[in-house]
Amino acid sequence: MVWFKRVKPSIRTTDKRDVPEGLWWKCEECGAMIHKKQLEDHVYTCSDCGYHFRISPYRYFSILFDNDTYQEFDDALRAGDPLGFTDTKKYSDRVHDTIGKSGKTEACRNAWGEVGGNPLVVSAMDFGFIGGSMGSVVGEKISRAVDKAVELNAPLLVISQSGGARMMEGAFSLMQMAKTSARLTLLSEKRLPFFSLMTDPTMGGITASFAMLGDVNLSEPKALIGFAGPRVIRDTIKRDLPEGFQRAEFLHEQGFVDCIVHRKELKSQIVRLAGMLKV
């Protein structure tokens, strides 16, 4: 028996499937709903609270390079499987599946172009590819970015966005820490500036190698920066951690980060620093 019967037809609302996917983004900090166009206008930051969304290397390239004009290089490098590593699946299958699902080919992209009318080489990491982890290809790309900067007599900017070394490559991954750090000495010898921008997150072997070696170490606001994560540290020392521990602002207070820069001001900051350090 039906107790209630709808006499009049309900008001028809727009079906959810009529709304294009990705049109609205939710801020992970304050929960605000942001239209895609507004998000683009604010370089993928929340206009309410300033939260910085993770973005791809290509979006950083668009923000930085004059007229969105740049030349990508060494984009054909692909990860191998030197150890035949398998956890829940084969490493080679994991790489293949990630490429197929994301359209990304590795956790780092290199490009060069003009920023403020002067040449700049940028190596940007991508958390969307296996957590932005550094394997042999990422280490090689960053090393080649150093070589390109020397070739062009230009500064180098490395944008870190990574969970650390890629465990599936074992020692091949760990040696990239030494390899990239050693390669950066070429810039010192040529008196070329190296800028390191740490974004959320910059962890593990990335922090323990090139990310902290910049002539100027910059960070986006509230980026998580450290070696082991705060939960691991807290469980190990059995003590509560200071408020904001391992966040950019905390590291800035301790002198590990030279400057916290909003993404809107990133290009102008790089232009200013490059001008100051130009020889």
From Swiss-Prot:
Listed InterPro entries: AcCoA_carboxyl_beta, Acetyl_CoA_COase_Trfase_b_su, ClpP/crotonase-like_dom_sf, COA_CT_N, Znf-ACC
GO CC terms: acetyl-CoA carboxylase complex
SUPFAM superfamilies: ClpP/crotonase (SSF52096)
EC number(s) from the headed UniProt entry: 2.1.3.15
Cofactor note: Binds 1 zinc ion per subunit.
Domain CoA carboxyltransferase N-terminal span(s) in chain numbering: 23-279
Any single GO BP term: malonyl-CoA biosynthetic process
Location, primary (coarse class): cytoplasm
Cell compartment(s), UniProt: Cytoplasm
Catalytically driven reaction(s): N(6)-carboxybiotinyl-L-lysyl-[protein] + acetyl-CoA = N(6)-biotinyl-L-lysyl-[protein] + malonyl-CoA
Family of this protein: Belongs to the AccD/PCCB family.
The protein's name: Acetyl-coenzyme A carboxylase carboxyl transferase subunit beta
Organism from which the protein derives: Chlorobium limicola (strain DSM 245 / NBRC 103803 / 6330)
